[in-house]
Amino acid sequence: MDVTVSKVDTKLLDLLVCPLTKGSLSYDREKNELVSEKARLAYPIRDGIPIMLISEARRIED
């Protein structure tokens, strides 16, 4: 499934924050994830819905 960020999704991205750090997120189009650089976590997007649960996040390795 190819998911692209639309105008509405961009507004949503501006509102969403990392649930752990409350910091901003960036969108990784290649992996279809929202990334928190501060927490070193990547939150998956499934069927166009960001899964903002720490337990579902992937830890980003160096």
UniProtKB/Swiss-Prot annotation:
It comes from the Bacteria. GO terms for cellular component: cytosol. InterPro entries: Trm112-like (IPR005651). It holds the Pfam family Trm112p. PANTHER family: PROTEIN PREY, MITOCHONDRIAL, ZGC:162634. Belongs to the UPF0434 family. HAMAP family: UPF0434. This is UPF0434 protein Arad_4458.
